[in-house]
């Protein structure tokens, strides 16, 4: 029996059940255990003010205490500098990496409008300042339903949500206007990750069976760039790696906002899909370029 740890939100349970189905299809028995995290309890602060690993710490501890065998996360929530006894054993194929700007149908605005945008993400806030320079940004926390309800009630003129979360939950946006934002996503946005203990050879072997190689390569490159730059989720950093399997070419674009200035960097490397050292090398190179 594989014990799967997860947070209790609808989105987290969707992700855990997706992993559970993949494992069941391979003949494994599974059970899901819900564990509440700091990020679920503290809803009145920015994530960057709460600390590192706000959605992972309690699940990490449960794994280390042998209460669960694996934990399912949104990969972007896992700190790039993590507990050395834990590792990402598998990632699933990436869903949409896009951010959506969503607003009520009776609101009309343009790039110069003084609108109130709800988001808890420092990256979204910093990048959107270049698109909507007169916008005011307000803290927005809670699950997807809660955020959309607050928008409908008029607490914000617009909010930003990840398209992946909307798709996974099957949420209808027919009551709203929305569009994809032309900004770089958070590193590993739209990717479901499965964590395990580094010394659990059996579980590592099992998770290899559900790992999506291209997504793993791309996410490793993006997260390495962030790690090299430093700062984790407290830094307005975006990155997107895309691997062209036909031409065996990995491309990375990254950007960061420092002192109200948007800095971009990009690069590419020829590599096979399993040459993760080259993905790490490219990530380090671009992260360093943005740092200096």
Swiss-Prot record:
Single GO molecular function: hydroxymethylbilane synthase activity
Modified residues (S-(dipyrrolylmethanemethyl)cysteine): 233
Protein name: Probable porphobilinogen deaminase
Cofactor: dipyrromethane
UniProt-listed Enzyme Commission number(s): 2.5.1.61
PROSITE patterns, per database record: PORPHOBILINOGEN_DEAM
Entries under InterPro entries matching the protein: HemC (IPR000860), Porphobilin_deaminase_cofac_BS (IPR022419), Porphobilin_deaminase_N (IPR022417), Porphobilinogen_deaminase_C (IPR022418), Porphobilinogen_deaminase_C_sf (IPR036803)
Protein source organism: Methanocaldococcus jannaschii (strain ATCC 43067 / DSM 2661 / JAL-1 / JCM 10045 / NBRC 100440) (Methanococcus jannaschii)
Entries under SUPFAM superfamilies matching the protein: Periplasmic binding protein-like II, Porphobilinogen deaminase (hydroxymethylbilane synthase), C-terminal domain
Keyword vocabulary terms for this entry: Porphyrin biosynthesis, Transferase
Family under the similarity heading: Belongs to the HMBS family.
Note: The porphobilinogen subunits are added to the dipyrromethane group.
Top class in the EC scheme: transferase
UniProt keyword Transferase present: yes
GO cellular component terms listed in the entry, alphabetical order: cytoplasm
Highest taxon, organism lineage: Archaea
């Amino acid at each position: 029996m594989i014990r799967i740890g997860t947070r209790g939100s609808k989105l987290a349970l969707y992700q855990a059940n997706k992993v559970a189905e993949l494992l069941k299809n391979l003949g494994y028995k599974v059970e899901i255990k819900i564990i509440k995290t700091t990020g679920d309890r503290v809803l009145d602060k920015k994530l960057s003010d709460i600390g590192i690993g706000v959605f992972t710490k309690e699940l990490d501890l449960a794994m280390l205490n042998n209460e669960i065998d694996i934990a399912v996360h949104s990969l972007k929530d896992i700190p790039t500098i993590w507990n050395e006894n834990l590792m990402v054993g598998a990632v699933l194929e990436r869903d949409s990496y896009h951010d959506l700007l969503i607003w009520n149908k009776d609101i009309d605005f343009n790039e110069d409008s003084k609108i109130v945008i709800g988001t808890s993400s420092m990256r979204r806030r910093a990048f959107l300042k270049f698109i909507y320079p007169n916008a005011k940004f307000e803290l927005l926390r809670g699950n997807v339903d809660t955020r959309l309800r607050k928008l409908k009630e008029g607490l914000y003129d617009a909010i930003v949500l990840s398209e992946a979360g909307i798709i996974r939950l099957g949420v209808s946006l027919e009551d709203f206007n929305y569009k994809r934002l032309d900004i770089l996503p958070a590193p590993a946005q739209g990717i479901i990750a499965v964590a395990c203990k580094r010394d659990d050879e059996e579980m590592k072997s099992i998770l290899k069976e559900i790992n999506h190689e291209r997504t793993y390569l791309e996410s490793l490159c993006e997260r390495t760039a962030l790690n090299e730059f430093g700062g984790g989720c407290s830094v307005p950093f975006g990155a997107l790696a895309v691997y062209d399997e036909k031409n065996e070419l990995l491309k990375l674009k990254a950007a960061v906002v420092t002192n109200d200035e948007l800095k971009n960097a990009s690069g590419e490397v020829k590599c096979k899909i399993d040459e993760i050292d080259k993905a790490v090398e490219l990530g380090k190179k671009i992260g360093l370029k943005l740092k200096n």
